[in-house]
Amino acid sequence: MEYKNQTENRAFQEMLQAAVKRLQNRSGEDLAAKSGAVFHSSRNMLEVQSFYETIEIQLPEFYINSDIDEWHYLTLLHYLDMADGTEGSQKLITFGNLKDGLIRGTKFDRTAEQKLEKLLQDKDPEKIQKACKNLGAEFTETKADLCAVFPVLPRYPVTLKIWFADEEFPASGKIFLQDHADHYLSVEDAVTVGEILLQKLSEAFSSL
């Protein structure tokens, strides 16, 4: 996910500046109401929960108090910009089911499954659960062996379903979004969120 050359880095900086500029036309109250963030008017600051940490965003510059990955930061700004307050029905969808997700989203669904198979290889269930928990996940009962819901952004949970290895099959996993995801991020940003989750999972396993 890290950009390697200067042209691409410049493109990233332009996207960042454009995102901040759009947000500066909006009030903190409005952004909070639509995104699920908390606005502290006395400090002119937004507070956003992402994974296991609370990120403070200082208005009007939109500086943050965290050393999160730059793409995580840009996605957070895009989320604040696009959020319209739509409630979800808890129905899960794949990335390919996103609006405009047919090509990019479907490709990510396949890539994520391949990466998860490698990531989960030789990991025991307890270790997998611990890695998810360390990223702030909550667990729900489903037909999968493990279902972890990650609080990636206030109204943008990401669900990871895992089937543990048995005698016939290796461990496998799939990532899902909720059916209102299109109201909060574009398919490009959704894929970035998925990549961030995979990266964080990889780091969480390494630190156990």
Give residue ranges: language-model regions:
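Short Lys/Arg-enriched alpha/beta "domain-start" segment
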Residues: 1-43, 72, 80-138
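Intrinsically disordered, low-complexity regulatory segments enriched in Ser/Thr/Pro
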Residues: 52-78, 163-188
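Conserved binding-pocket/active-site segment within a compact domain
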Residues: 123-183
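A recognition module on extended beta-rich or small alphabeta surfaces enriched in W/G with H and D/E
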Residues: 178-208
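Short, charged/polar micro-motifs that form catalytic or ligand-binding hotspots
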Residues: 66, 114, 118-121, 146, ...
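Domain-length accessory/inserted modules outside core catalytic folds
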Residues: 46-47, 102, 106-117, 141-144, ...
